[in-house]
Amino acid sequence: MIETDKLATEQRIIAATPASSHEEVFERALRPRQLDDYVGQEKVRGQLEIFIEAAKRRSEPLDHVLLFGPPGLGKTTLAHIIAREMGVNLRQTSGPVLERAGDLAALLTNLEANDVLFIDEIHRLSPVVEEILYPALEDYQIDIMIGEGPAARSVKLDLQPFTLVGATTRAGMLTNPLRDRFGIVARLEFYDAEQLSRIVRRSASLLNAQIDPNGALEIAKRSRGTPRIANRLLRRVRDFAEVKADGQITAAVADAALAMLDVDPVGFDLMDRKLLEAILYKFDGGPVGIDNLAAAIGEERDTIEDVLEPYLIQQGFLQRTPRGRVATLLTYRHFGLSVPDTGRTERGEWDTPDGK
């Protein structure tokens, strides 16, 4: 068994967060530029088409937009598309960068009419900055303090009408006053294999990589429902195809490349398997407490809860119960193990989503 550490966690090939600034540059080159080119998220895309067209006809700024959902699903891409479809400029920042009220005021006062301000990780705004944002969103005004001490006074500045697009992976951490100021709220969902296959084929075309439909589907099925992961795997499979094959990405070539990268047919890597195997072999399938599990695999509790578990739970391989983590029937089948007769089904620990 290969041991992993925090650095390895951050560098997982199937991580949904950007691995480096270099990867972010690569992502920008592959981003769709119009809603018509945006694959998936049909409901969100349909809503935005109507709202954007209505705002353009009235020559008004688009209502403020909140995009939330797991990382890597296209929130930043949608923000850029919104600005491009509206025909305006986009200014981009993130919640942690805006440390002081003056940082936000400088951005707001430099916006032109109907511009888009995109704040990523908006749930990480400081309370001081958030207070400045409220009147800006409602009345296109901000209050700034001039002077210090007893001579200090508040001055109200008028702003150009603008659209705030906020993105977050943790909508529950937004304060109610901030959430209520967004007129358009959209949740981005995980993609299915067919949608990801279309994304892979489009990206391969932009990269001048030769890929057949089955090769694209093989990559898509292991991409954990996330376009960012699909594009990252495509790059690595392309490298493999150029060196070990004739450059053509087929299903067999993709399978061999992904096996070399330790990405299995359901998108698990070594860390996923390490966690599930610990539950199966060290704790007899569970239940096991999170602290015991963290000690057993040498990972931090937060890493397990925030990085490893969400996908495993979402796909039905892991259950959180009041007594601890439990491997599901699907996990036993995935590892080719017989299911022990321990009465867990009667206790509700192995119920499948349909109750069977």
UniProtKB/Swiss-Prot annotation:
Region (Head domain (RuvB-H)) residue spans: 265-356
Annotated region (Small ATPAse domain (RuvB-S)), positions in chain: 192-262
Protein family per UniProt: Belongs to the RuvB family.
Residues at which Mg(2+) binds: T76
One cellular-component annotation, GO: Holliday junction resolvase complex
InterPro entries given in the database record: AAA+_ATPase, AAA_lid_4, DNA_helicase_Holl-junc_RuvB, P-loop_NTPase, RuvB-like_N, RuvB_C, WH-like_DNA-bd_sf, WH_DNA-bd_sf
Biological process, per Gene Ontology: DNA recombination; DNA repair
Lineage, broadest ranks: Bacteria, Pseudomonadati, Pseudomonadota, Betaproteobacteria, Burkholderiales
Entry keyword set: ATP-binding, Cytoplasm, DNA damage, DNA recombination, DNA repair, DNA-binding, Hydrolase, Nucleotide-binding
Catalysed reactions listed for this entry: ATP + H2O = ADP + phosphate + H(+)
Species of origin: Burkholderia lata (strain ATCC 17760 / DSM 23089 / LMG 22485 / NCIMB 9086 / R18194 / 383)
Residue span of region Large ATPase domain (RuvB-L): 4-191
Function noted in UniProt: The RuvA-RuvB-RuvC complex processes Holliday junction (HJ) DNA during genetic recombination and DNA repair, while the RuvA-RuvB complex plays an important role in the rescue of blocked DNA replication forks via replication fork reversal (RFR). RuvA specifically binds to HJ cruciform DNA, conferring on it an open structure. The RuvB hexamer acts as an ATP-dependent pump, pulling dsDNA into and through the RuvAB complex. RuvB forms 2 homohexamers on either side of HJ DNA bound by 1 or 2 RuvA tetramers; 4 subunits per hexamer contact DNA at a time.
SMART domains registered for this protein in UniProt: AAA
Binding site residues for ATP: L30, R31, G72, K75, T76, T77, E138, D139, Y140, R181, Y191, R228
Source superkingdom: Bacteria
Pfam family of the protein (one): AAA_lid_4
Record's protein name: Holliday junction branch migration complex subunit RuvB
Record-linked CDD domains: AAA (cd00009)
Domain comment (free text): Has 3 domains, the large (RuvB-L) and small ATPase (RuvB-S) domains and the C-terminal head (RuvB-H) domain. The head domain binds DNA, while the ATPase domains jointly bind ATP, ADP or are empty depending on the state of the subunit in the translocation cycle. During a single DNA translocation step the structure of each domain remains the same, but their relative positions change.
Enzyme Commission numbers on file: 3.6.4.-
Gene: ruvB
Subunit structure: Homohexamer. Forms an RuvA(8)-RuvB(12)-Holliday junction (HJ) complex. HJ DNA is sandwiched between 2 RuvA tetramers; dsDNA enters through RuvA and exits via RuvB. An RuvB hexamer assembles on each DNA strand where it exits the tetramer. Each RuvB hexamer is contacted by two RuvA subunits (via domain III) on 2 adjacent RuvB subunits; this complex drives branch migration. In the full resolvosome a probable DNA-RuvA(4)-RuvB(12)-RuvC(2) complex forms which resolves the HJ.
